[in-house]
A protein has these predicted regions:
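N-terminal accessory beta-strand-rich subdomains and adjacent acidic, glycine-rich linkers
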Residues: 1-169
Length: 169
């Protein structure tokens, strides 16, 4: 991936526009968690490398690389309640990827559409949105599944350029 963008828009702030890095904090975590209601396993291994980037403007972005996944989240020191208007993630794949995605005709959907399979360059020309989760298969055989957690508004994905995915809430 190349020239990717991550940002967060609140009612009063745009975080991630011309970021100024203040501090970098790295941490390795390797712990065993005991689930409240154990189903199959009595412990869960929680192992990841964490990178916390603290920026000028009262916000940070935390990245976690697990053995089998990757996650990020925004943290803010902004005063009072903050209404999140939009979260932006622009991914620019260097090579054309095969995408596996649902493309409904509108926002009213029961998530029953069949998954379509098309390259990122074909999708760019279709000018259609897609829903998460979305699976991208790279020419090298890597698979990248993009999803979302803790939803109150459902994100959409659009293809703006040849190998560019724009995820917007």
């Amino acid at each position: 991936m190349d020239n990717c963008v991550i940002g967060l828009e609140t009612a009063n702030h745009q975080l991630g526009i011309h970021p100024k890095l203040n501090k970098v904090v790295r941490q390795n975590v390797n712990e065993e968690l005991t689930p409240i209601v154990p189903l199959k396993f009595s412990t869960i291994t929680n192992r990841y490398n964490q990178l916390l980037l603290k920026f000028k403007g009262g916000y940070s972005v935390e990245f976690r690389a697990f053995d089998d996944g990757f996650a990020y989240r925004f943290l803010t020191d902004l005063k009072g309640e903050q209404e999140i208007m939009n979260e932006i993630l622009r991914l620019n794949f260097v090579d054309d990827c095969l995408l596996h995605l649902q493309q409904p005709d509108g926002f009213k959907t029961s998530y029953e559409e069949e998954y379509r399979h098309q390259t990122s360059s074909e999708w760019k020309n279709s000018n259609r949105m897609a829903l998460l989760p979305l699976l991208a298969s790279t020419p090298k055989g890597d698979k990248i599944l993009m999803s979302e957690t803790n939803l109150t508004a459902y994100p959409i994905v659009t293809g703006k350029h040849k190998n560019h995915l724009y995820i917007k809430k």
